[in-house]
Regions:
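Active-site mouth loops of central-metabolism enzymes
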Residues: 9-19, 71-83, 112
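Short, acidic/polar
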Residues: 16-28, 80-96, 142-145
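Beta/alpha (TIM)-barrel catalytic core signal, keyed to glycine-rich beta->alpha loops juxtaposed to Asp/Glu
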Residues: 113-295
Length: 295
C-alpha cells in the first residue's frame, strides 16, 4: 500500500504573525507533513514572504520540505507567457527563501497559452536548477495530454478540487453510459487519466462543499452527511475532519489532500485520518449521505 500523506496549504498564512506561522510549520514537520503548497497570488505574496521569514529563522527546515508554488493567475486574465512564468518563479523563490521550488504548477488553464513558450520557460527553470518538477491545476485530461505532447519537462502533478460533496470527478466514472446529469464528463476522466499516466492528484478544499456553503463539517445543510461522519468518527476515535480526509485517501489514486488550515489543532486532527482505511460500505455510505446517488 502506498504511503498516505497530507500537504499544508498556505493560502491563509498571511493572517498569521511570523511566530504563529513558525508554530504551524513546525507542527506540520513534527507530524510528517512535509509538503507545503503556495501560489504567487496568495495574500498578494504575503504568504510566501511570511513562510520565507520562517525559513530564515530555521534554515534546517528546507531539507525536510517539499515546497510547491503556482503562477499564471493575474487580475482579470491568465498569463502563461515565458517571461511571466520565469519572473514569477524567481520572485517566489526569493520570497520563500528556498533556493528552488520542488514543484511548480500552472494555476488554472490559460486559453491563450503558447505551449512552445511554456516549454521554453520550463526548460529554463529546470536547467537552471530553479524547479525540479512541474504540474498544473484544474486541468482536464485533454489539456494535460496536449501539454505533455509538447513539453520536455512533463506534467507530473494536477491539483483539482475534491471533497465528499464536491466529487463530480468520481460521479462521472460511476455513471458511465447513463442518462443522469452525473454522467456528464466535465474532466475527461481525469482520475483515470492521471492514474494511467502516473500523474499525482492533489485534492484542494477537501472539507469544503462549495464556495457558497463553505465547509460541510457541522453545516446543518449537510445533516445526513454529518450524522455519518459522527458515526465513523466515534468508531475510529477521531474528529469528523479526519474522516473526511480518509475518504479521499481511500481512493486507489493515492491522492494528496491539501489542507488549508492555520490551526495546529485542526492540522493534528486531520493527520489522524492518514492511517484510517474505510471499508467500501463506509466510503460509499459517506458518498450517498452527502446527497449523491448510485446508478
Amino acid at each position: 500500500m502506498n504511503k498516505k500523506e497530507l500537504a499544508l496549504g498556505c493560502m491563509r498564512i498571511a493572517n498569521l504573525s511570523i511566530e504563529e506561522a513558525e508554530k504551524l510549520i513546525t507542527c506540520a514537520l513534527d507530524n510528517d507533513v512535509t509538503f507545503f503548497d503556495h501560489a504567487d497570488i496568495y495574500g498578494k505574496r504575503k504568504c510566501e514572504e511570511i513562510f520565507g521569514e520562517v525559513l530564515k529563522r530555521n534554515p534546517s527546515f528546507r531539507k525536510r520540505m517539499i515546497i510547491q508554488s503556482k503562477c499564471g493567475i493575474c487580475k482579470g486574465y491568465y498569463d502563461f507567457s515565458k517571461e511571466h512564468i520565469i519572473t514569477q518563479v524567481k520572485e517566489s523563490i526569493r520570497l520563500l527563501n528556498c533556493e528552488y521550488l520542488d514543484i511548480l504548477l500552472l494555476h488554472r488553464p490559460d486559453a491563450l497559452a503558447d505551449i512552445n513558450e511554456v516549454n521554453e520557460a520550463f526548460d529554463y527553470l529546470y536547467e537552471n536548477g530553479l524547479v525540479k518538477e512541474f504540474g498544473v491545476s484544474n486541468m482536464n485530461s485533454w489539456q494535460i495530454e496536449l501539454y505533455n505532447k509538447k513539453l520536455n519537462q512533463k506534467i507530473k502533478h494536477n491539483q483539482i478540487q475534491l471533497s465528499i460533496v464536491h466529487s463530480h470527478i468520481i460521479s462521472e466514472g460511476l455513471f458511465v453510459n447513463m442518462s443522469e446529469n452525473e454522467a456528464c464528463d466535465r474532466s475527461g476522466g481525469i482520475i483515470e487519466y492521471c492514474m494511467l499516466n502516473d500523474i499525482k492528484i492533489q485534492a484542494w478544499s477537501p472539507v469544503m462543499a462549495c464556495w457558497a456553503d463553505g465547509t460541510f463539517i457541522d453545516n446543518p445543510k449537510y445533516d445526513k452527511l454529518n450524522e455519518k461522519l459522527e458515526e465513523l468518527s466515534i468508531k475510529y476515535g477521531v474528529k469528523k475532519n479526519a474522516i473526511a480526509i480518509s475518504w479521499i485517501l481511500r481512493h486507489p489514486a493515492n491522492m494528496i489532500p491539501i489542507v488549508g488550515t492555520t490551526s495546529t489543532t485542526h492540522l493534528l486532527e486531520m493527520v489522524k485520518g492518514l492511517p484510517i482505511y474505510l471499508t467500501r460500505e463506509e466510503w460509499y455510505g459517506l458518498y450517498l449521505a452527502s446527497g449523491h446517488k448510485l446508478p
